[in-house]
Amino acid sequence: MNFQKMTYSNLKHNRYRPELGKTSGQISKMNTHLIDEQNLAGSKNWVDRSLAAVWHPCTQMKHHESLPLIAITRGEGAWLYDDQGNAFLDCISSWWTNLFGHANSRINQAITKQLEKIEHVMLAGFTHAPVVELSEKLSALTQGNLGHVFYASDGASAVEIALKMSHHYWQLQDKPEKKKFVCLENSYHGETLGALAVTDVALFREAYGPLLQSVFIAPSPDSRKVKEGKSAEGLVSECAEALETIFAKEHQNIAAFIIEPLVQCAGQMAMHSPEYLRRVRALCDQYEIHLIADEIAVGCGRTGKFFACEHAEIWPDFLTLSKGISGGYLPLSLSMTTEAIYRAFYRDQTSQGFLHSHSYTGNPLACAAALAALTIFESDQVLEKNIERAHELAHAFRWAKEDSRLEHWRQQGMILAFDVKSSVLKNPSSFAREMFSASLLEGILIRPISNTIYVMPPYILTASQTQNMAEAVQRALTQVLK
């Protein structure tokens, strides 16, 4: 099949259904969904209206002339359903956000209960129970090391807050020259101008280069860079030494170093050792530079611990969270910081406070969802059970280790990725779109990054669901590469 010409109606052959554990043939006999002309017309109507009125994110809209746009009407557990009844397993947690399944009854109830009290109130001059309780619980999760929480609505905004706080802190310390930032090569921290400045993915930043502050870019300790005969430890040392070279020369001008701990997610799931984080923490202390841990994607248990930094037994000066913190329900982000940094802004002069704000800062509904998510973590022993889920994930994708067309199989907790060798790609620039389309025909949602295929599923899959997911990825890949 020419996946570039795939249309919405092709999905009527969707054979990957929620009745997992059965073969696709058994499923077809049980419950094959047929699209009638009236329903198909309705579906096209929603799609056409969306294409006419909605500018979709991270998308070249012209690609939708051939790439399917799916009208989702509901979700249940790990499944998304379109308006034709086709089911898609959400293998990437709806852009890494959904932790405990769609329409989770406990999170639904928490939001509904809060909705009956207060839906929103400005956080300047006011406070409310959900934001207080959430802040206290998050602080406790850091053993009090990061005891102050500033809220926003999306990941990039949380990064902006950390960058601005760091910059402003050094001004208050009479070191205004410390205003530069350091990031890793191939890093991604968001799309707003400050966050984009510390992003090193050309696809996202090239068009806006003239608007962005210049930054220092340090080599990434990406484990895929380990050469034959070399060790991962050696790569960590090389990258740490290169970072120290930057610090030694420019520390008087540097405010902070920002990093996604353990996994550079949008950077093709590049993974590195916790030892690198330990080296970075020591260097930041030595050269009086703030450490910003961007845990927007890797936080909330995704790497195996609640905070990725815990693997290295270090705490940053700033830590950002978003995506999974509300269980994937509502826009919520935050930047946590230390008592020392908070106290630097605690002054008589208004101008020396941190005057950043957003209209929906600390929204009660979003905070209620986050509190429900934290309760699920505790009551369901999610982190402990994710150890077994991670083993099941590795076992299900063992075929990818043995496939000669693939390389760089890697895993960190509930993130698993591998790369398709460039030598087997017929059209490298369109591979991700072709794989996305092929996966829909198998009833799964994946969204490759260039030649990197990855899964980041919700924390609710059974072993059989995980196995079926892996088999569906394998079938889709076979179709694209044949």
Where are these regions (language model features)?
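Short hydrophobic targeting helices and cationic amphipathic motifs
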Residues: 3-4, 11
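Conserved N-terminal phosphate-binding loop of PLP-dependent enzymes in the Aspartate aminotransferase
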Residues: 27, 31-482
